[in-house]
From Swiss-Prot:
Disulfide bonds: none annotated. InterPro entries: UPF0229 (IPR006698). Residues 63-111 are annotated as: Disordered. It comes from Teredinibacter turnerae (strain ATCC 39867 / T7901). Pfam families: DUF444. It comes from the Bacteria. NCBIfam families: PRK05325.1-2, PRK05325.1-3. Belongs to the UPF0229 family. This is UPF0229 protein TERTU_3150. Residues 83-92 have a biased composition (Basic and acidic residues).
């Protein structure tokens, strides 16, 4: 009978296994609560834990119990009103018996919700479940630091932990056979002659002495020698890595009011958390633009108050310049995400179309554009519609009207593709 011992380290919480089973069972309720939390949270509080409320009726278990009809003989404790043989009127259907609830209600019934807390780790797991960067491919990089060990046969040297017992014993057995073969053949001849001769004869005594000497020589051969030890050989092979770079392009022009900028920042913060959590080797390039574009760090990207006019092509040109100098397409998976309110200088939308179709999209794996506006779509949106028709597999565009649209649109843009 086989026994499997799970030696994986568990957390300090003794009920972790039951908790994980509970989270899997009610993941639909939790996913909805996580989605609602993203809509109402501030930018700085988007990655903390969350209190999840599940209606009691959804976690109730089916049970067997007596129905309200039929005739039953029961012993009721605490009876001070009836004697044996008294007839008790049957209550009407639906009456009698107290219920549980959360206070007064005009509906006549109610139950408290079951509320529990999920950690930051669990919150982010549900937040980014089934999401992935589209079209991510393996690329062999110069100076690659990732390796894996592969079997490469047998070696005569190695660490004790890699010793190959079967090969070592086989080698020892072969050595003993090779070194004692001549002696064993002579020993067989001597034993055959001894069976013919008289035991007391002088010739037999000489053969016995020779046989004893042969046995002693055979025993002197070591059973296992250092030369017999064989080790499993493992060699390092470089691995192709999925290094990726994400360009975040945000419009901070004067037409973007504070509410629109907050929606854009929340979208990019969600994207940034997703990349940092799921892809360790992903670099992020932040570009803010109005009439001119500027590469900034994370702090300035999310919290700078600089503003101005609107020339979207300045950000696309800067992205192309950075690609040429730092991120060659042959070695990097390149992604782009752009957020704007759609307002642009009149003739600049045509320039944006040319930059995307001629320079950027042939190099990138995926490029997404979100337009944050409740107004009618303008020239930039229509120009990007032409881009979408030319590159349907690597370009995507969505419209956001409020903060409630951020998470659903984010999941649409980065939904894991099934092949």
């Amino acid at each position: 009978m086989s026994y499997i011992i799970d030696r994986r380290l568990n957390s300090k919480k003794k009920s972790m296994v039951n908790r994980q089973r509970f989270l899997r069972r009610y993941q639909q309720h939790i996913k909805k609560a996580v989605s609602d939390a993203v809509d109402r949270r501030s930018i700085t509080d988007i990655e903390s834990g969350e209190s999840i409320s599940i209606p009691t009726r959804d976690i109730s278990e089916p049970i067997f119990h007596h129905g309200s009809g039929g005739k039953n003989n029961r012993v009721l404790p605490g009876n001070d009103r009836f004697n044996g043989g008294d007839h008790i009127e049957r209550p009407e259907q639906g009456q009698g018996g107290g219920g549980n609830g959360s206070g007064a209600s005009d509906s006549g019934e109610g139950e408290d919700d079951f509320v529990f807390q999920i950690s930051q780790e669990e919150f982010l797991n549900f937040l980014f479940e089934d999401l992935a960067l589209p079209n991510l491919v393996k690329r062999q990089l110069a100076g690659n630091e990732e390796f894996e060990f592969r079997r490469a046969g047998i070696s005569n040297e190695g660490s004790p932990g890699k010793i190959n017992i079967i090969r070592s014993l086989r080698s020892a057995n072969s050595r003993r056979i090779a070194l004692t073969g001549k002696k064993r053949r002579r020993l067989k001849e001597v034993e055959a002659e001894l069976e013919i001769l008289e035991p007391e004869s002088a010739e037999a005594q000489a053969l016995l002495a020779e046989a004893e000497e042969l046995h002693a020589k055979i025993k002197r051969i070591p059973w296992l020698d250092d030369f017999d030890l064989k080790y499993n050989l493992h060699v390092k092979h470089p691995l192709p890595t999925s290094k990726a770079v994400m360009f975040c392009l945000m419009d901070v022009s004067g037409s973007m009011d504070q509410a629109t900028k907050d929606i854009a920042k929340r979208f990019f913060l969600l994207l940034y958390l997703f990349l940092q959590r799921n892809y360790e080797r992903t670099e992020v390039v932040f570009i803010r633009h109005h009439t001119s574009a500027k590469e900034v760090d994370e702090q300035e990207f999310f919290y700078s108050r600089e503003t101005g006019g609107t020339i979207v092509s300045s950000a696309l040109k800067m992205m192309d310049d950075i690609l040429q100098t730092r991120y060659p397409a042959s070695e990097w998976n390149i992604y782009g995400a752009q957020a704007s309110d759609g307002d642009n200088w009149n003739d600049d939308s045509v320039i944006c179309y040319r930059l995307l179709t001629e320079k950027l999209l042939p190099k990138v794996q995926y490029y997404s554009y979100i337009e944050i506006t409740t107004r009618e779509r303008q020239a930039l949106w229509h120009a990007y519609e032409q881009v979408l028709s030319d590159f349907p597999n690597t370009f995507a565009m969505r419209q956001l009207q409020s903060a409630a649209d951020i998470y659903p649109v984010f999941r649409q843009l980065f939904q894991k593709q099934t092949t």
